[in-house]
C-alpha cells in the first residue's frame, strides 16, 4: 500500500472524473479536467529538467492554478514550496535560496518582486506566470505564461514510481523569523493532516482506496477554505476534499460579504477560517446584510471550522445565535505536528471554554522531564506529538534536534506550545513559549521585526511583543529606546520597516522608553516589555488600526 499524495488524488479522480473539483469565480474544473491540466504541468516541469525531489515554488493566491500546481508538482515527483505572497524581496530571496528552489509558478502581479529576486537566486531556472489581469512585465526574466506553456505537453498519467517515503515540505516561520521547511513523509502528513485518520474515532483509514470509495458512495460536500493556501491548514482542507471527491470553492482575496455570497450561491457545507481575524468581519458582514433586510440562503452550511488560531467564545456564541444548529470547531496544531486537538461547540452543548481542547491520543502534555502531566495538577507542560511526525527541518540539523526530541524511548515533535491538563483530561492552551506573536493566524517572530526597527537611524534598541487586539487576537507592539535627541514616530518606523518585512509584521502601536531592559548577557527581557505595554497606554497607535485594546 503506497500512501502517496499523488496516488490518493488519482484514486478519487478515477472514481468521480465528471464531478466538479474546483470552483473559483466563474471558473470550474471537474476532476478529469484537473487531472489533465496537472498531468500537462508535471510533464512540462520534467521537460524543463525538474527531477525527483527538486523544489518548485507556488507563489499564488487561492485560485484554480494553485491547486493544479500542487497536484502537478507531486505528480512530477517534485516537492512544492509554499511561498507567502505577502513576502517582500528579502524574505523571498531567503526562501528561494533556503529551499534550493529550481522552478517557480507565480501570479503576474508579483512579477516586479520576482524580477528583483531572481538575479540573486540562480538555481531558479524555470518560471511559469499565471495571468491575473495585471500587466507587470515577466518576459524580462524569461517567464512564460502558464497555460500556453503546459498546453504543448502530454495529458497522460505516465510518471515514475512513487513512495509513501516521498517528502512533502511545509514552510513555516522559524525562531529567527525566517521560514523553516518542515519535512514530512507523504504517509505521515496524510495520517495527521490530510485525512488519513478518522478525526471522530482517532483510528487510521485502513486502505488507500477507502477515501475514493467514499467519493463514489456519497454526494460531494462543498468546502470553502478562506485562509491562503500557504497555510498547512488550507492545504489540509483542500487535499482532504480532493481525496474524497468533494468540491473546493476558492477565494483569492478575503472578502466577508463575498464569502457569504459564495456560501449562498454554491451551497457550501463547510467553511474554514482563521480565528477572530476572519470571524469578526464575517459576523459583521452577516449582521449588516440582515439589518439591511436581506437574507442569504445558508441552509446548506453545517460546519464552521477555525484553524491556525483559536477564536473567542463570544464570537462563537454570536454565530450560533445567527446560525443555530451549526457545529463550531477550532483546532490546535502546527506545521510540525499536524492536528493535535479540537474544541467543538454546537447549539445545546456547553462551550469548552477559551483555548481549551480535547487532544488526540498521540498528543501529550509533558513536564520538563518528559513525563506526562497529571490531569488537574495545575502543572504547566509542553505540547508534544508522537506517532506520525516529521523527519525534521530541511537543512537545519540544530533546529531539528531542538524540536524533535526523544523521551523514554519515544520520539516527539515539540514546537513550543505550553498547556495545562484539566481534571477532565481536556487541555488549556497557554501559548507559545518562544514569545511568538499570533496575529490573525500569522505567526510573527520578534527578532525579525526588532532587527528591522533597529536599522532605523533614530532607534537605539527595540523589543516587540504581542498586545490584545479585538479583530486579530494580537497585533505587534514596539517598545523602543530612541537614540539621544531623537524621537521616531510610528509613521516613520512603519515606512522604514515595510521595506524589510511583510506588512502584517509591521508594529501597530509604539511605546517609547528611556531604556530597553536586557539581561547582563544582553538577552531581551520580554516580560518587562509586556509589562510596559500593560502598565500604560501606547504613545502612538496606528491611525488606520482599529480593534486595539
Regions found by a protein language model. Give the residues of each.
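Conserved ATP/PPi-binding loop(s) of AMP-dependent carboxylate-activating enzymes
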Residues: 358, 371-404, 442-444
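AMP-binding/adenylate-forming catalytic domain of the ANL superfamily
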Residues: 130, 502-523, 546-548
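Conserved AMP-binding/adenylate-forming core of the ANL superfamily
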Residues: 18-63, 67, 71, 88-93
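Conserved AMP-binding/adenylation subdomain of ANL enzymes
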Residues: 190-226, 230-272, 285, 289
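Gly/Ser/Thr-rich phosphate-binding loop
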Residues: 147, 243-244, 268-273, 283-352, ...
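Conserved pre-ATP/AMP-binding loop-to-beta segment of ANL
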Residues: 17, 152-171, 177-178, 213-222
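Structural core segment of the AMP-binding/adenylate-forming
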Residues: 47-48, 75-148
